[in-house]
UniProtKB/Swiss-Prot annotation:
InterPro entries according to UniProt: ATP_synth_OSCP/delta_N_sf, ATPase_OSCP/dsu
Membrane topology, record value: Peripheral membrane protein
Places the protein is found: Cell inner membrane
Record's subunit section: F-type ATPases have 2 components, F(1) - the catalytic core - and F(0) - the membrane proton channel. F(1) has five subunits: alpha(3), beta(3), gamma(1), delta(1), epsilon(1). F(0) has three main subunits: a(1), b(2) and c(10-14). The alpha and beta chains form an alternating ring which encloses part of the gamma chain. F(1) is attached to F(0) by a central stalk formed by the gamma and epsilon chains, while a peripheral stalk is formed by the delta and b chains.
Protein task: F(1)F(0) ATP synthase produces ATP from ADP in the presence of a proton or sodium gradient. F-type ATPases consist of two structural domains, F(1) containing the extramembraneous catalytic core and F(0) containing the membrane proton channel, linked together by a central stalk and a peripheral stalk. During catalysis, ATP synthesis in the catalytic domain of F(1) is coupled via a rotary mechanism of the central stalk subunits to proton translocation. This protein is part of the stalk that links CF(0) to CF(1). It either transmits conformational changes from CF(0) to CF(1) or is implicated in proton conduction.
Protein keywords: ATP synthesis, Cell inner membrane, Cell membrane, CF(1), Hydrogen ion transport, Ion transport, Membrane, Transport
Designated name of the protein: ATP synthase subunit delta
Species this chain originates from: Bacteroides fragilis (strain ATCC 25285 / DSM 2151 / CCUG 4856 / JCM 11019 / LMG 10263 / NCTC 9343 / Onslow / VPI 2553 / EN-2)
Gene Ontology molecular function terms on file: proton-transporting ATP synthase activity, rotational mechanism
NCBIfam families listed in its UniProt record: ATP_synt_delta, PRK13429.1-3
Keyword Cell wall biogenesis/degradation (UniProt): no
Entry similarity comment: Belongs to the ATPase delta chain family.
Cellular component GO terms, alphabetical: plasma membrane; proton-transporting ATP synthase complex
Lineage top rank: taxon: Bacteria
Length: 186
């Protein structure tokens, strides 16, 4: 079976189960943390794919990655036990991302990422969040990242769109125009 099909089936089943139990929001926060762990912890996927690591060790690792020192919800525990029992831990990252997408669509939550060369103050960040929420008619989750390599300006990713107003991109465009112009001369 394909990764997307398996992941979507598990995510839909988890969403239905969470709705039935009234635990959608808690599960959402646990899966946000788990998805963040997949992105930031090197080797996390490799450990889950490793057949030498026992199921109990994988279970404890996943629970720690999802909720840290706190005890995860009963719904999360049952879901992880099912995934491990069916030997689908390879797809867990995609299952969590699919669940997050389903939850955000259902609850009208937009996701944005603001990349700037210098830190942005809280007032500006909140104004951007409110403006995006007003335009999208949705609640906005906004992540801010400082990346000095853009040299100035900003890059704003929102739901699958990118607004790139960075100096680095503008300089690349000017450079490309000069290269194209010189090619015509030769």
């Amino acid at each position: 079976m394909e990764v997307g099909i398996i992941s979507m089936r598990y995510a839909k089943a988890l969403m239905a189960y969470a709705e039935e139990r009234g635990a959608e929001e808690r599960l959402y926060h646990e899966l946000v943390t788990l998805a963040h762990s997949f992105r930031t912890v090197k080797g996390f996927c490799a450990v889950l794919d490793n057949p030498i690591v026992s199921v109990n060790e994988k279970f404890n690792l996943i629970c720690t990655a999802a909720d840290g020192d706190h005890k995860p919800s009963e719904e999360f525990i049952r879901f992880i036990r099912l995934v491990l029992k069916e030997r689908r831990e390879t797809y867990l990252q995609f299952m969590s991302l699919m669940y997050l997408d389903l939850y955000r669509k259902k609850k009208h939550i937009g996701v944005g990422k603001l990349i700037t060369a210098v830190p942005v103050d809280k007032a500006t960040e909140e104004r951007i969040r409110q403006t995006a929420a007003h335009i999208l008619h949705a609640y906005m989750e906004l992540e801010t990242v400082v990346d000095p390599s853009i040299e100035g300006g900003f890059v704003f990713d929102i739901n699958d769109y990118r607004l790139d107003a960075s100096i680095a991109t503008q300089l690349k465009k000017v450079k490309q125009q000069f290269i194209d112009k010189n090619r015509r001369i030769v």
